[in-house]
Design a protein with these regions (language model features):
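Glycine-rich tight-turn/loop motif centered on a GG-T
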Residues: 10-17, 48-53, 104-116, 146, ...
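Short, acidic/polar
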Residues: 20-29, 75-83
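Short Fe-S-cluster ligation motifs
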Residues: 25-46
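Conserved C-terminal portion of the radical SAM core fold
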Residues: 38-41, 117-182, 190
Length: 190
């Protein structure tokens, strides 16, 4: 439950868990748009409804359509990342959001995402599982001192490169924009 996110659990918006048929229909629709080979599968942080078995099946269904499969899901256990690799996943994207631990807990007051150490150590679990490609990022605008977050991410990346040197890395710089409905406002606008 992220206080800044429009998808947070208390937002009364309709949510859908796609059936296998709907998943395949989405894949076909994407392929009709252009000859895409890269696919990023994204889920909410709900392991009961969109956990590892669901993600594994979605990966299996994607293989006939796409050659490069990445996921952006809740942080997983090492063995879960390894299992998803067996289903064709070759990359993971995870946003730490902020490295400021005290504020992290304010922005993520409950749920699995509220566990700072579990999230930040997820990158190690990806490396231990031999994930081919890891994408990481902080949410610029969440903290007033955004340069500190970027510096901490750079140190974290350097650590990962030393320990899991076989892995390829990418860095993402998503930024917050002002909310039009008067909700959470960024501390910095870039």
């Amino acid at each position: 439950s992220c206080v800044y996110c429009g998808f947070h659990i208390s937002n009364p918006m309709p949510r859908t868990i796609l059936t296998e048929e709907e998943i395949v229909n989405e894949y076909k629709a994407i392929k009709k748009l252009a000859p895409f080979e890269n696919l990023l599968l994204v889920t909410g942080e709900n392991p009961a409804k969109a956990g590892v078995p669901y993600i594994a099946r979605a990966l299996d269904l994607a293989k006939p359509y796409f050659s490069n499969l990445k996921i952006e899901v809740m942080p997983l256990k090492t063995e879960e990342y390894a299992e998803l690799k067996e289903h064709g996943m070759n990359g993971v994207i995870c946003f730490q959001e902020t490295y400021h631990k005290a504020n992290y807990n304010i922005y993520h007051p409950r749920g699995m995402k509220s566990k700072f150490e579990w999230r930040v150590n997820g990158f190690d679990r990806m490396g231990q599982a031999g994930v081919h490609s890891i994408g990481m990022g902080v949410l610029i605008g969440l903290e007033k001192e955004w340069r500190t977050d970027i510096t901490m991410m750079a140190y974290h990346l350097r650590y990962l490169q030393k320990h899991y040197w076989q892995t390829k890395y990418s860095v993402n710089f998503p930024r917050m924009r002002p909310s039009e409905n008067g909700g959470f406002q960024p501390n910095v606008i870039m």
